[in-house]
Amino acid sequence: TVKERSAVVRFKVVGEDAYFLAWTTTPWTLPSNVALCVNPSDTYCKVKSVDGYVYYMAEALLDKVLGKLAEEDKPAYEVLETYKGTDLEGKSYVALYECAAKEAEKQHKKAHYVICDDYVTMSDGTGIVHIAPAFGEDDARVGREYDLPLVKFVDEKGCMTAETPFAGMRAKPSKAEMEKDPNVKSADPEVLKDLDAKGLLFDAPKFEHDYPHCW
């Protein structure tokens, strides 16, 4: 098992002073994000958080994600509205990275909106999953269903491409590689740093998982 940092990211809702909170275990895939996925039949809430932001996320995970923000005299959040996942389908958000918006335009495909699929679970994260169809089976499947653009900002060597602000950094260097060459730069911490500087990183919790190292 590998201990890594995941990311809970703020995606700005178009036309609203609010954000979708989405979780990913692979921050290096975020520049290739083209959609956010919710479970169609689960309940989602729009909440005013004590941190001053308005968030959309799954009702079942509110306390797990926002609970730690609670102050002595203030609850962590106040529920403003409640939705079914299907109510959020089609809602647009601002692309995290300009490169993905440009690539979607080039492919003449709609991107950066909410889609629905049953594979989204309420066991961890925020109940909203970031979708990059070039990476991951479920992402690829829902990408085909919604005809999302295929955006892949990682080359065959596993390096981030020049379109991104992380050109040349390794998307997923193995531990052995990192030890062998101290100059190998992993994209994950840099993506987290960049999002943090933009005020878009809500949290970067550590987690453990098994990771197959292959391209």
Give short role names for the model-derived ranges.
Residues 1-31, 43-45, 90, 99, ...:
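Residue patterns forming the tRNA-binding/recognition surfaces of aminoacyl-tRNA synthetases
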Residues 35, 42-128, 137-141:
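Protease-associated
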